[in-house]
């Protein structure tokens, strides 16, 4: 089963907009209260927190029953990945609706349960969104507020496609900062444009932050969203190209398991830490995984250790083999190649040694 998030804009009037605003405000206030209770009592399972706080929360915040249940689930989900501190939620945080409080009517409208009753909302979407909503099965939805507009991010389920032919072997993909991705066939996707945009955004952000006003804060949020959209678009193009290439070559895809890499970069200098912090490898990997799943291609994750130091011809591993960021020369056999292509070859070889090629994704990539 493939699940995709389809975002559509909601058409509202004064009455329905007020209902959504009130629902969002109460829902997130309830999440904050529930989070405080969960933290103080160390109650992080939804079943246990429900018994402790459901009735009190529903009465205090005047939430419908199912929205109270969803607030409990949202709070507990945040503690699944981080229990080191008490979590807080902004007044415009996403509101989660499931099948009991959200229902599509065709593909152009949806019913939502709010604090002011059940309302029917008209949805504004394009041809691609209409196609996805009509072909898949809708699940839960998130209510979002972005730049003064309300959106629904709807989870749409699609059946698994037939498995593609992978008799051609494996296409290894090395991900990096200078070259965002390099495959074992030698094709690279430069990160120069992304780096230039990030540098411009960082300087712009510095100028805006100096003003310290509410309008500057809103401007800063807009800048961050724009930079994020640009990065996601670049990753979309790269992942689409790689999956299409693998499909044509009848190959499976192999990626590095880079979970925890930012924590290991804590000893780097300030510039390198900034680059690592802005490296959207998880987004690229996630896009490759879901696009490969849509194409019926398996993806395998391999151990990334020493892929850039090991010769893909003779297997000799030495830090000195890596002459520079872009250059690799084996001290044992003299093999010379682009360092990223050599690493991609090693990733390919490790994947081929795996017991089996399965549809696999690393949960840590999406944390």
Predicted ranges, named:
Residues 1-367:
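Nucleic-acid substrate recognition interfaces
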């Amino acid at each position: 089963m493939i699940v995709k998030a389809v975002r559509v804009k909601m058409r509202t009037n004064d009455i329905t907009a007020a209902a959504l605003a009130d629902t969002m405000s109460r829902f997130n206030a309830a999440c904050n209260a529930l989070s405080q209770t969960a933290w103080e009592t160390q109650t992080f399972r939804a079943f246990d927190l429900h018994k402790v706080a459901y009735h009190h929360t529903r009465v205090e915040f005047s939430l419908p029953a199912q929205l109270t249940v969803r607030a409990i689930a949202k709070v507990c989900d945040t503690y699944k990945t981080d229990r080191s501190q008490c979590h807080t939620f902004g007044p415009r945080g996403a509101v989660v609706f499931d099948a009991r409080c959200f229902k599509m009517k065709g593909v152009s409208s949806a019913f939502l349960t709010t604090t002011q009753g059940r309302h029917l909302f008209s949805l504004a979407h394009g041809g691609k969104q209409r196609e996805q909503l009509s072909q898949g099965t809708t699940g839960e939805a998130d209510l979002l507020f972005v730049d003064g507009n309300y959106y629904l991010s709807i989870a749409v389920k699609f059946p698994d496609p037939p498995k593609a032919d992978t008799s051609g072997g494996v296409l290894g993909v090395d991900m990096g900062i200078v070259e965002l991705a390099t495959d074992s066939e030698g094709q690279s996707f430069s990160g120069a444009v992304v780096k230039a945009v990030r540098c411009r955004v960082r300087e712009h952000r510095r100028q805006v932050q100096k003003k310290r006003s509410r309008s500057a804060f809103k401007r800063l949020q807009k800048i961050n969203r724009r930079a994020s959209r640009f990065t996601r678009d670049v990753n979309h193009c790269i992942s689409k190209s790689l999956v299409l290439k693998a499909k044509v070559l009848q190959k499976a895809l192999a990626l590095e398991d880079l979970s925890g890499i930012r924590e290991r970069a804590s000893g780097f200098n300030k510039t390198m830490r900034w680059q690592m912090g802005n490296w959207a490898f998880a987004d690229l990997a996630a896009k490759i995984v879901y696009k490969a799943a849509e194409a019926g291609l398996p993806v395998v994750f391999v151990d990334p250790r020493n892929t850039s130091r090991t010769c893909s011809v003779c297997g000799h591993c030495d830090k000195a083999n890596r002459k520079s960021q872009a250059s690799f020369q084996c001290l044992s056999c003299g093999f010379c190649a682009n360092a990223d292509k050599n690493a991609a070859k090693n990733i390919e070889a490790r994947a081929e040694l795996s017991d089996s090629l399965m549809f696999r994704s690393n949960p840590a990539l999406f944390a």
